[in-house]
Amino acid sequence: MEVILIKPVRKLGKIGEIHKVADGFGRNYLLPQKLAIRATELNKELIVKQKHELEEKDKQIKSEITKINDLIKDQKLIFVRQTSDDGKLFGSVNNKEIAEKLSQAVSYPISHLNIILDTQIKSTGIYKVEVRLHAELSTEVTVIVARSESEIQDYLREQKTEKSTTEPLAESA
């Protein structure tokens, strides 16, 4: 199936590009999500005319998301959970919980689909989690999972000492 992208799609392409994709990918994902339209002759002509307009709209969205990313990137999300003696959580911290807490912190609705977890969070510690609000823009937040408030303070002190020991090395190089 040939499609014309009307929004940028990560790992596929930019607005106005024509791509041949698997039928299922086009029918079940790209078309219903309004990321692409079928590449008919009429649609090709329409997209050529509307491409500039679509790119301008995308630039506006990018600038808004850049502002939101600036708010998000310095966030530290703290989760206090019950754990076993060896630090393993009874359950896990998932992308829905992270999205909910991040939405409250920045006063902007963030979907759990925008939270990219490399691995499941099943033990205490400090984790870097990717937040992707746009196909071309992403940022990271720090997620701290601990048993108690005192453990959180220990993690934060530890993180500050790591920063202070790495900064002078960067300056001297």
Curated annotation (Swiss-Prot):
Q: One of this protein's GO BP terms?
A: translation
Keyword RNA-binding listed: yes
GO MF assignments? rRNA binding; structural constituent of ribosome
Q: Which UniProt keywords apply?
A: Ribonucleoprotein, Ribosomal protein, RNA-binding, rRNA-binding
SUPFAM superfamilies in the cross-refs: L9 N-domain-like, Ribosomal protein L9 C-domain
Entry GO CC: ribonucleoprotein complex; ribosome
Keyword Transmembrane helix carried by entry: no
The record's section on PROSITE patterns has: RIBOSOMAL_L9
Source organism superkingdom: Bacteria
Query: What functional role does this protein have?
Result: Binds to the 23S rRNA.
Its family remark reads: Belongs to the bacterial ribosomal protein bL9 family.
Protein name per UniProt: Large ribosomal subunit protein bL9
